[in-house]
C-alpha cells in the first residue's frame, strides 16, 4: 500500500474494503438459496442484486487508492465548491435524461403509481378519479385497494391513500406533460441546499464542494432522482427546513414551519417527524425559544390542517360514500389503524433494517458512512453536527418500530429523508466546523490530511463516472424487464389488456390506468379465464380476444 502512507487513507481504505466485502459475501450467499428470511420478494431480490454493486464499490476503492495521485479529483472538488449552480445544472440534465432513458418514465412500484395517479387527478382540477364500480376489482387489484388507492365501492371514486403533498408538487409537471422532470428538478435543488448547508457549517468552499459531490456522486441520489418516489421531495424539504433553522429568527421559523408542513404531508408524516424532532427540541430550549417555537407551529398549521386533516377527512368520506351507517365510526377506525403502524420489531424487521444500513453503504460513495460516523464523533461539540447526528440516528432507529420492509426501492428508502446528514457529517471528518476551531498546537485529526482528502476526492469522481453508470445499467435493466411483463401485442387501437400475474414478478403493479380510463389502453388484473370472459361479455360486448400469451390477454374490436 505504497500510495497510502497516511493513517487516514489506510484506515478509510481498509475499513471500507472490509465492510464492503462483508456485504458482498452476505448478498452473494443469500443469492445462492431461496429462503427469503421473512422479507418481501422485491426487497429480497433487490438486496441480492446489490452483490455486483458491492463488487463495483471494492473496485472503486482500489482504483482510488492507486489512482488518487494521478487524478485531478481534488481540483474538480475545489471547482465544484465555487460553481454549485453549474454542478446542479449538469445534474439536472443527467437526471432528466435518466428519467426517460433509464427509468422509461415509468412508475415502477405502487408507491410511485399512487402519487402519479393522484397528480393526474389534480392536474385535471379534480380531487378523485372515477372507475366503473362493478369493475373495481379488475382495475385495481383487491390487495391494493384502501392500501395504495382508496376506493368507493358505491360510486367508483378513486384517490390515493397517502397524503397528497407530493402529488400536488407533481401536478404542474403532469399538466405540462413532463412529469418525469419533477424529481430531477427537486434533486438538483437539493444539491444547492446541501452546498449552502456546508457553507454554514464550514465557511469553506472546498468543504462545500466535498459535501456537494459526495451527494451528487452517490448512486442512490441518481436512482431516486429519476424515479417517481416521493423521497427526493422529502430530502429537499428536510434540507431546506434545516437550512432555515441554522440561524433561527421568527421569520425563518415561520418559513421552516411552512416547509415542514409540506414535508409532513408529502405522503406520510413519519419521515419529517423523525428528522425534525431534534431541531424542534433545540429551538424550544434556546434563548427566546418559546417565541421561535410558537412561530414554527404557526408555520406548520395551515398546510397541516388543509392537506393533513383535510385529506384525512376527504379520504374517509370517499371510502364510505353510500354507507351512512359506517361513516359514523370511519374516522376513529382509520385513526386507530394509522397508529397501529408502530409496533415492537420482530426478527424480520430487525433483519430488514440491518439490510437497509447495508444498502445505504453500497448505494453511496465508498467510505461515506465511515467518514460520517467519524465526523459525528469528532465534531460532536458543534451544535449543528449534533443536530444532524440526532436526526440521522432518530430516523434510523425510528423505523425499527415500523413493521414492514420497504419492498421496492433504491438504496434504503426509509433513511432517504435524512440522507443529507451523511455528506455533511462526512465533510466534518475532513474539515473542522467553524464553530469548533482548531486549538493551538493540537494535532490534525485522522482524516484531515491532504492525502486522505485526495483519496476521498478520487472515490467521489470514480463513483460519479463508474458507480452511477453501473447502477444506471442495473436500474434500466430492472425497469425494462418489468415493462416486458405485459402481453407482447403490437396493435395501438383502443383495447383492454387483462394481465395474468402468475408468470410475472409483481405483475399486479403494472395495472396502471388513467383516473377516468381515458386513452387507448385499459389495464385489468385477471380473475381467471372464465371470470374475465364473463366480465368482458357484460361490460365490453363489442370487444373480442385478439391476443394471448403467458402475461395475459388483449381484447379489442380488431
Each model region followed by its residue ranges:
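Membrane-interface alpha helices of multi-pass inner-membrane proteins
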Residues: 171, 197, 211-216, 239-244, ...
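Interfacial juxtamembrane loops and adjacent helix segments
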Residues: 124-166, 170, 324-338
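Hydrophobic/aromatic-rich transmembrane helices and adjacent perimembrane loops
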Residues: 115-116, 224, 231, 364, ...
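Hydrophobic, aromatic-rich transmembrane alpha-helices
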Residues: 63-65, 69, 189-195, 277-286, ...
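Membrane-lumen/periplasm interface segments of specific transmembrane helices
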Residues: 264, 270-371, 462-467, 471
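Transmembrane alpha-helix segments characteristic
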Residues: 16-23, 83-96, 215, 260, ...
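Signature aromatic-anchored transmembrane alpha helix within multi-pass, membrane-resident enzymes
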Residues: 81-90, 296-305, 393, 424, ...
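Transmembrane-helix signature of polytopic, membrane-embedded enzymes
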Residues: 86-87, 192-219, 235-236, 249-255, ...
